[in-house]
């Protein structure tokens, strides 16, 4: 594997990263940051605690597009950004990285309070839900901003075929 973040690239790279995880495994406490979405370079890592669980994320994913599915809602934005990458990437990453830092800072504070006995398991699940909700706001904002651009011919043909098979039309 050449990269941690593997973007679909047609014949030379016929698949892409589906989800990513970073785990902090302390002796007294573990937190697992998951994207739950493709392309970690464009995704937000959310803290998930086995003690707290995962919030409801909509219908289960399949290989067909559904606006009711968490993964597909983000996949639409990821694919739109790729069609106009240079136009949007700097501003998008600024917003995404600011949110990521906010999530990390809040998680570090919660973890400290949990270890001190000041936060219970219910509050851990609340932090996870808050992180997903904040990410959803980022998605809504950027789906409104990003306009579909034009990809190089062969790359566009490959993505067109993949999108058509999934029932995804821009």
Located regions from the model:
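C-terminus-biased signal that marks the final domain/tail of proteins
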Residues: 1-170
